[in-house]
């Protein structure tokens, strides 16, 4: 599977991705895998800063949009403007979210679940797909 993304120089071949990502990062970011619930580094982490794409470093989420949904994965109620693409799964049951810059698989977004957030959305994100940068 060829990587997708824009023309900002963040597109790479699978061989290039394998050289810069861990096997688990490649499985999730490039092959659209999912980490086991409750196992991710950022599931219960609430530091002040920004979450970036683990593949290309693009900022994706502010820490102020992270909340505890109890789903077993990091949850955010919105991404940074233009940072995340949404693609309905072929079965129409879920909407996949990917990094707009490199096409890396982040997880899925769910709407209308009743969470008391400004958007009533839950971006259910694999910890392996993101990297936290603390506020300075």
UniProtKB/Swiss-Prot annotation:
EC number: 1.8.4.12
Compartments reported by the entry: Cytoplasm, Cytosol
Database matches in SUPFAM superfamilies: Mss4-like
Gene Ontology MF: a single term: peptide-methionine (R)-S-oxide reductase activity
Binding site for Zn(2+): 53, 56, 99, 102
Keyword annotations from UniProtKB, A to Z: Cytoplasm, Disulfide bond, Electron transport, Metal-binding, Oxidoreductase, Redox-active center, Transport, Zinc
Catalytic residue positions: 124 (nucleophile)
Catalytic activity: L-methionyl-[protein] + [thioredoxin]-disulfide + H2O = L-methionyl-(R)-S-oxide-[protein] + [thioredoxin]-dithiol
Domain MsrB residue range list: 14-135
Pfam families in UniProt: SelR (PF01641)
UniProt key word Transport: yes
Tree of life domain: Eukaryota
Function in brief: Catalyzes the reduction of methionine sulfoxide (MetSO) to methionine in proteins. Plays a protective role against oxidative stress by restoring activity to proteins that have been inactivated by methionine oxidation. MSRB family specifically reduces the MetSO R-enantiomer.
Protein name: Peptide methionine sulfoxide reductase B5
Organism: Oryza sativa subsp. japonica (Rice)
Gene from which this protein is expressed: MSRB5
């Amino acid at each position: 599977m060829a990587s997708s993304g824009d023309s900002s120089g963040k597109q790479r071949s699978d061989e290039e991705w394998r050289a810069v990502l861990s096997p688990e990062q490649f499985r999730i970011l490039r092959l659209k895998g999912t980490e086991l619930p409750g196992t991710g580094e950022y599931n219960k982490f609430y530091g002040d800063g920004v979450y970036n794409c683990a593949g290309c470093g693009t900022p994706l989420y502010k820490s102020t949009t992270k909340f505890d949904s109890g789903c077993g994965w990091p949850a955010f109620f919105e991404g940074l403007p233009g940072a995340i693409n949404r693609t309905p799964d072929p079965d129409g049951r879920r909407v996949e979210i990917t990094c707009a810059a490199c096409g890396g698989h982040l997880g899925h977004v769910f709407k209308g679940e009743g969470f008391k957030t400004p958007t009533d959305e839950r971006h259910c994100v694999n910890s392996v797909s993101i990297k936290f940068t603390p506020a300075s």
